[in-house]
C-alpha cells in the first residue's frame, strides 16, 4: 500500500505499465515508489515559512523546493528578489534545511542567479521553465535568420 495518497496511471509516467519496475505487480511498484520518491513541499506561503522547522522535521519529508515568485508575493514584495525580506526568508529556509540534513532546492530564472544560489549552499537549482528556454532559443534563431 502507498504511504499517504498515491495514484497510478499506466501511461508515460507509469512506464506504460510495462517498465521493469512493474514486473512484480502493483505491490512491488508501491513498495519501490514509497522508498524511491522524494517528498519536497514547496515553500511559497507565509504558513510554510513560519512552520518550516516543523515541516522539515517531519519523517518522510526529504527537503524543500522554494518558489521565489509566490514567496515574494506572500512576503508583500512581488518579484523583488533583492529585497532584504526575500533574501532573509530564502536564507532562513536554507539554514533550516541544513539543520535537518534535508535537500534545499531553489527555482530561478537564469544562470547568474543559479550560480549565486549554488554558492549560497543550495543542493539543487531549477533554472527557468522549458517554455521560456524554448521561446528564448526560437527568438535567437529568428534574430539570426533576419540579420
Q: How would you label these PLM feature ranges?
A:
Residues 1-59, 73:
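Conserved anion-binding
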Residues 1-4, 131-147:
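C-terminal helical cap(s) of enzyme catalytic domains, especially alpha/beta-barrels
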Residues 1-3, 57-63, 119-125:
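Glycine-enriched alpha-helix->loop->beta-strand junction motifs that scaffold or abut catalytic
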Residues 39-44, 64-66, 104-107, 124-127:
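Hydrophobic faces of well-ordered beta-strands that scaffold small-molecule active sites
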Amino acid at each position: 500500500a502507498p504511504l499517504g495518497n498515491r495514484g497510478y496511471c499506466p501511461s508515460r509516467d507509469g512506464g506504460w505499465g510495462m517498465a521493469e519496475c512493474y514486473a512484480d505487480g502493483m505491490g512491488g511498484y508501491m513498495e519501490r515508489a514509497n522508498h524511491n520518491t522524494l517528498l519536497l513541499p514547496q515553500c511559497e506561503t507565509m504558513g510554510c515559512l513560519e512552520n518550516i522547522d516543523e515541516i522539515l522535521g517531519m519523517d518522510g519529508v526529504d527537503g524543500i523546493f522554494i518558489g521565489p515568485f509566490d514567496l515574494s508575493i506572500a512576503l508583500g514584495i512581488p518579484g523583488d528578489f533583492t529585497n532584504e525580506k526575500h533574501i532573509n526568508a530564502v536564507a532562513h529556509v536554507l539554514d533550516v534545511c541544513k539543520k535537518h540534513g534535508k535537500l534545499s532546492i531553489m527555482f530561478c530564472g537564469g544562470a547568474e542567479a543559479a550560480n549565486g544560489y549554488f554558492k549560497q549552499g543550495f543542493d539543487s537549482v531549477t533554472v527557468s521553465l522549458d517554455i521560456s528556454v524554448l521561446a528564448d532559443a526560437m527568438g535567437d534563431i529568428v534574430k539570426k535568420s533576419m540579420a
